[in-house]
A protein has these predicted regions:
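An amphipathic, hydrophobic-aromatic interaction surface with interspersed Lys/Arg
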Residues: 1-270
């Protein structure tokens, strides 16, 4: 948390995404979308975000000069919400940090999603989401907005369920953006370093570094579909359908155990 002092008072606000509430996260996501569309600038984003966190009725730049000066001098305290890089022409690029393992929109407008770190997601839906994520990258490269929107909705429907399965409305765009960001964030965590499960650090990179570095199709029997059949053949979780219905963390842990034992045996033979 960070403390902001202005107008002879002090207020404490979150310093990064992992400290925000669900309501604060939704506002941050809305501002991120507006900035991405070019509706607001990075500077306006920071002003609006700080004003919101402080509970102000308007942007603080609408207040007295003294307050503007005080808060302008403390804006660096919001740096935990943004990453800063340098562009090809030397310009500063500001990017909102949306990476978190917390599902900050688990309950939204009648929709209920999986838990933090994708807890509750089945292995089948996990594989489907990875395939859809790859398709979205291709659609983005082709600037195919309609396909991107369709893929985002498909990913959301893998992670979230509507309260009335007989009357499922269109997926809210904000929820769809969140679902893709959330899934991508957890997957990046799996690929980039140890993940803590039950207090133990598990480094899944031994499983997926090669898989992630190669452009494999999901149905080529050497990628995820092939893995499903291999696990089903072991009989640990049952047949293919039962493997698909198994929590994906359970399957990943099983694969990790198998790979770890294989590497251990390989070292002992040397």
């Amino acid at each position: 948390m960070e403390k902001f002092t202005y107008n002879s008072k002090t207020a404490e606000v979150p310093s990064c995404l992992d400290e925000v509430s669900s309501e604060q996260y939704r506002q941050f996501l809305i501002l991120s979308v507006l900035m991405n569309r070019g509706t607001i600038s990075p500077g306006q984003f920071r002003v609006k975000w700080l004003s919101y966190l402080l509970g102000m009725k308007a942007d603080y730049t609408m207040y007295r000069r003294e307050i503007i000066r005080e808060l302008d001098g403390q804006l660096e305290k919001l740096d935990g919400f943004f990453s800063y890089t340098t562009g090809k022409e030397g310009e500063r690029i500001v990017t909102p940090i949306l990476k978190t393992g917390r599902n900050l929109m688990q309950d939204f407008g009648g929709w209920h999603g999986v838990g933090d770190m994708l807890n509750g997601l089945t292995f089948g839906n996990f594989c489907d989401c990875l395939d859809l994520l790859q398709q979205s990258k291709q659609a983005a490269a082709e600037k195919d907005e309609s396909t991107i929107n369709e893929i985002f909705q498909d990913i959301t429907l893998k992670l979230d369920r509507y309260k009335d399965p007989e009357k499922i409305p269109a997926v809210p765009s904000l929820l769809a953006i969140h679902a893709v960001n959330f899934f991508s964030a957890v997957w990046e965590m799996v690929l980039s370093g140890p993940v803590y499960i039950g207090g133990e650090a598990i480094d899944f990179r031994i499983l997926f570094q090669k898989l992630a570095s190669e452009d494999r199709k999901a149905d080529d029997k050497t990628g995820w579909t092939g893995i499903v059949f291999e696990v089903a053949a072991s009989g640990v979780f049952g047949n293919k359908k039962e493997v698909d219905d198994t929590p994906f963390w359970d399957v990943l842990l099983y694969l990790y155990k198998c790979k770890f034992e294989y590497l251990h045996q390989k070292r002992n033979k040397k």
